[in-house]
Amino acid sequence: MERQHSALAMPFASPNRTARVAILLSTYNGATYLSEQLESLIAQTEQDWVIHASDDGSTDATLEILYQYQRRLGDDRLYIHAGPRQGFAANFLSALKRTKDQADYFAFCDQDDLWEADKLERGLAWASAHPTSTPLLYCSRTRLIDSTGQLIGFSPLFRRPPSFANALVQSIAGGNTMLFNAAAAQLLSLTPFQVPIISHDWWSYIIVTGCGGRVHYDEYPAINYRQHGNNLIGSNSSVRDRLVRLQRMLKGTFRQWNDVNLEAVSHFRQHLTHENQRILELFGSARRAPLYRKLSLISQSGVYRQTLPGNLGLVAASLIQRL
């Protein structure tokens, strides 16, 4: 599933290219599952890759494991960097800024998942069919596994097309599924470090769609997303998960997230397409408008979530000043 936007030509060059794909691995006290993840990267059917591991100050055996694999793979295939120690989103952004000229494609990677062997191959097959000057972002559904690697479910299957109007109010895929091209990397690397973002995956979806890129949502689960004590997201489709989202809305968390995202997007306004500037303005106006105008402006903006319950929640959030 994808949505085509008017292309934004982003000039880029890779004079320091070291591989077709740069895998951006963020680590922090991830020794328990890190070796399994690294083995799944090594087993990829696409082998033209390098790993850039950005460690955010681990105090367990994470760095020791990374150095063991560096000795095995060579320091020209596994690079180890010190992260900024400002949270996972900043760590990924730092890794991207550091490597943006060194590959044709980039893939975010968490420390505790397991990639399917064809994960990179699937993303590259889609991306390579499109112009390199267009920002491209591939993402997918996920299998959910427990701490022992047993299947426990799947992330939601979304059917509606990806777009900026959707991205403003919903993130449809985890960063651990994402692969993007150099044009998208150059674009995302313009994000100022001092600008807070909620998460690197939601931010990537917002910016690539907003600036005229293409996003493809693969219904095939390309990774096994591990759920454990430090990383529980749930299937996102159960009654419990819906109640959690309702509680967040009532507490104002959704509104706070929108505040952060809209402030960050304001720094990219000149890069947005004219149509997406219009959507952004209408959505912002809807959030500020008196009650009797809110729903009309929401409708005019065209923002939407992927499901009927999600869109009903969007209306409810608007009516109770939690948008």
Write out the residue ranges for each language-model feature.
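Nucleotide-sugar donor-binding/catalytic module of glycosyltransferases
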Residues: 2-237, 319-322
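C-terminal subregions of glycosyltransferases and related glycan-biosynthesis enzymes
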Residues: 193, 197, 203, 224-323
